[in-house]
């Protein structure tokens, strides 16, 4: 058969097919984790620099002076639990104890909510075990009115900023006390008055949103900065790169954080690019400052976030921070990590546990004891238990104490457009037919209303636990 492609190859100077005979076949590289279930964890690939060995650039330095450090790691706590090196933030013992307690409270909250999901009180939960320092120390380093655009494992920021635990539990249970009225997946909090932007289930969308908010803050001549968090898996999304481009071009006052906890659900971090270089090293490609941090070192996290926040507030531009850490639990209550990683990975993680490392540092300073640690753990567990008991008075999943069904169509338009009115009426009719036992006492709420009508009537219905 004649080679019909020969004229085309000749036109473009390409070699004839026969000339390629000695070339090896093309191959693809598929990343593989360092160990699998049943295997001994392998951390031989991990290079951990000594604490205090990385230089601390001036906050006003050119971005290029930070790039060498993106291949190293900001570390403050050494093997003897001492704070060493130029990144030591020199925090007073009382601040350290407050951070320790907030991290312990976050972990106790996670444990209680996890058990609640297993008991059927909520449909879903995600823990932050092993990553508490990133949220809590980060919150302590920021100003209270800086806007945070979080991912779903930053509950520690809300807790550090004093958001009521009961309100968080109401949202998780989607009960009648839920300020979001059951419209968000559990753990997708929203608290503008606490500088906490609504969590989205769409990965990485918060990155460009944070950059846009920071740009708006600068346009208004404000002094507040923005910060955002994504996992390393989400850094493979296009929104990550769009955010980096806008942040670099407009010198936006924003801190962009990548929490590299090694796993994106069951996907090894190599699928997001971890085998090639660090995630912090991407900063150089965009011409912005970059830092790589021991995410289990509370003092290092605080110091890095403070450095980047001060830089942004002084119009020094954006910073990309990678927190190197480990997701100690499953991705969520719907995940079984034993199906894809070694069960010993958590215990053998070389960077340890953030809560114990900070506690041991305080003990080394003579400012803490093991007995105080035990008592603190008891206190925070009781605090969470009391908040849970109070929230459960508003109902749990399937209990019946929830916002009326029809309210899902409210609070967007002042007057519902005709198409939503039709959809609402159809949904209510179908619900009555499919689940007649769920139809409570008839009331005027059986038809769609305006937002103003809905707010007044829903309050009355909620007091009875009725409604469609």
Residue ranges and their predicted role:
Residues 4, 195-396:
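Glycine-rich ThDP/TPP pyrophosphate-binding loop and its adjacent helix/strand module
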Residues 67-70, 96-98, 141-143, 182, ...:
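A generic structural signal for short, non-catalytic loop/turn and secondary-structure boundary residues
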Residues 65-67, 138-141, 246-247, 310-313:
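A general structural signal for short secondary-structure junctions and capping/turn motifs
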Residues 82-83, 155, 261-264:
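A short, flexible beta-alpha/helix-coil linker loop
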Residues 1-134, 329, 338, 343-468:
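Conserved acidic/glycine
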Residues 108-111, 115-252, 268-275, 280-281, ...:
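Cofactor-binding active-site loop characterized by glycine-rich and histidine/acidic residues
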């Amino acid at each position: 058969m004649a080679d019909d492609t020969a004229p085309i190859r000749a036109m473009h100077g390409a070699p004839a097919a026969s000339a390629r005979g000695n070339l090896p076949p093309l191959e693809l590289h598929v990343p593989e984790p360092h160990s699998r279930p049943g295997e001994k964890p392998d951390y031989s690939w991990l290079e951990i620099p000594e604490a205090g060995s990385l230089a601390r650039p001036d906050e006003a330095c050119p971005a290029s002076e930070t790039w060498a450090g993106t291949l190293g790691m900001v570390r403050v706590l050494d093997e003897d639990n001492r704070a060493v090196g130029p990144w030591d933030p020199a925090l007073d013992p009382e601040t350290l104890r407050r951070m320790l307690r907030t991290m312990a409270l976050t972990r106790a909250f996670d444990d209680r909510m996890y058990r609640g999901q297993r008991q059927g009180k909520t449909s879903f939960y995600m823990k932050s075990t092993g990553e508490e320092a990133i949220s809590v120390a980060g919150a302590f380093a920021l100003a209270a009115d800086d806007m945070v655009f979080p991912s779903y494992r930053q509950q520690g920021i809300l807790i550090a900023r004093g958001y009521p635990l009961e309100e968080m539990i109401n949202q998780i249970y989607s009960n009648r006390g839920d300020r979001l009225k059951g419209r968000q997946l559990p753990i997708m909090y929203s608290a503008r008055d606490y500088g906490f932007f609504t969590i989205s289930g769409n990965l990485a969308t918060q990155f460009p949103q944070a950059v846009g908010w920071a740009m708006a803050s600068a346009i208004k001549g404000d002094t507040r900065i923005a910060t955002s968090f994504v996992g390393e898996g989400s850094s493979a999304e296009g929104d990550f790169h769009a955010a980096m481009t806008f942040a670099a071009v407009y010198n936006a006052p924003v801190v962009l954080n990548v929490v590299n906890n090694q796993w994106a659900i069951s996907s090894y971090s190599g699928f997001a690019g971890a085998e090639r270089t660090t995630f912090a090293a991407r900063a150089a490609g965009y011409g912005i400052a970059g830092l790589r941090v021991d995410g289990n070192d509370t003092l290092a996290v605080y110091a890095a976030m403070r450095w980047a926040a001060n830089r942004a507030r002084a119009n020094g531009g954006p910073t990309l921070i990678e927190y190197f850490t480990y997701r100690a639990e499953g991705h969520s209550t719907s995940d079984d990590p034993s199906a894809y990683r070694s069960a010993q990975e958590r215990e053998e993680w070389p960077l340890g546990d953030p809560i114990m490392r900070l506690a041991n540092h305080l003990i080394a300073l003579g400012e803490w004891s093991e007995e105080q640690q035990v008592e603190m753990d008891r206190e925070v567990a009781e605090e969470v238990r009391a908040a849970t008991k109070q929230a459960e008075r508003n109902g749990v999943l399937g209990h019946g104490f929830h916002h009326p069904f029809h309210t899902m169509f409210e609070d967007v338009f002042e007057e519902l457009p005709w198409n939503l009115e039709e959809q609402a009426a159809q949904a209510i009719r179908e619900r009555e037919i499919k689940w007649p036992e769920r139809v409570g006492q008839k009331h005027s709420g059986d038809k769609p209303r305006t937002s103003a009508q809905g707010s007044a009537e829903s309050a009355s219905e909620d007091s009875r636990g009725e409604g469609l």
